[in-house]
A protein has these predicted regions:
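Extended serine/threonine-enriched, polar tracts that run as long, contiguous segments within proteins
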Residues: 148-237
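Intrinsically disordered, low-complexity acidic regions
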Residues: 196-215, 223-293
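OB-fold ssDNA-binding interfaces and closely related basic DNA-contact patches used
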Residues: 2-178, 240-283
Length: 293
């Protein structure tokens, strides 16, 4: 049983990983509810788990937007909605369509454009936010690993890919060096909440962890793999976008539109686009099925 299970897990071919990266760059519900969180200023040793059998990648992208929502107390809070194109397989996403239409209507209004797509520190703009999910855990001497969701930013993804895509003279690495059940290398990851740019510090530092100046592996035990096998594949961790997500996005957009005096929801042409976006989810029973026991 154990040997059969081990044989199903494999590291990802670099050629496949590069294709996924190119696809991610083009666009530039967790089963165990546990997340791996980095600690400010601490170098954490991290072991990434492999893709489940049948999965193409050990990580998946997440794309979302921050919007404004009114809670039960009447207070306005910021929250996220997923992107329907990536997470629902649709042709249109409501927030993306809103941004395109707003640019068409207010493109020459610098103040409006700053509110819509500005990148200031306290900006509430509608720029998409990207992150990636994989299964991983912190390596601690003598302790068993338990796969957790590690959500990381593009800078970390790029640093991981830089390590994976490195070449040894004339012989390129053909599989990723992180996820093999026996030979997966341990990472050293440091998060700096307030990096000292003058000293060359970055928000994230990612390298192979080393012993005697050499990268080292941390094999996964049969018990660790059996426990991991019971978790959802990473591609199923982010729920599929449906009608309820659309309704949440519509609510958040209307609040944002009112806060920023864009008044697009008084525009019949924009409301026609809203109806076209909504039609993508009508007749889809996915949301209803999720309610069934």
């Amino acid at each position: 049983m154990a040997n059969s299970l081990r044989s199903q897990y494999r590291a990802i071919k670099i050629s496949s990983l590069k294709k996924a990266v190119d696809k991610d760059d083009a666009m530039v519900g967790v089963s165990n509810n546990e997340y791996l969180n980095l600690e400010d200023g601490k170098v954490m040793k991290i072991r990434i788990f492999p893709a489940h059998p049948g999965e193409e990648q050990f990580y998946v992208p997440r794309k979302c937007y921050w919007l404004s929502f009114v809670n039960s107390d009447g207070d306005v809070k910021r929250g996220t909605v997923l992107d329907s194109i990536l997470h629902g397989g649709t042709k249109m996403d409501l927030v993306n369509e809103y941004v395109k239409y707003a640019k068409k209507k207010y493109g020459k209004d610098a103040e409006k454009m700053e509110a819509l797509t500005g990148t200031g520190l306290n900006s509430n703009a509608l720029n998409p936010q990207y992150s990636w999910f994989c299964y991983a855990d912190e390596v601690k001497e003598g302790e068993e690993l338990h796969a957790k969701i590690w959500e990381f930013k593009k800078m970390v993804r790029d640093l991981l890919n830089k390590l994976a895509f490195s070449e040894d003279d004339d012989e390129p690495i053909e599989v990723d060096p992180f996820t093999d059940v026996d030979d997966g290398l341990v990472l050293a990851v440091k998060y700096n909440k307030k990096p000292n740019k003058k000293k060359g510090e970055q928000y994230y530092e990612v390298d192979f962890a080393k012993k005697s100046k050499q990268p080292y592996s941390r094999p996964l035990s049969d018990d660790e793999l059996e426990s991991f096998a019971n978790l959802k594949p990473i591609s199923e961790v982010i729920p599929k976008y449906g009608m309820r997500d659309y309704e949440r996005a519509l609510d958040g957009l209307q609040n944002w539109d009112e806060e920023n005096d864009f008044n697009l929801f008084d525009d019949d042409e924009w409301l026609d686009i809203v109806e076209k976006v909504k039609a993508q989810y009508e007749g889809n029973d996915d949301d209803d099925e999720e309610e069934k026991p």
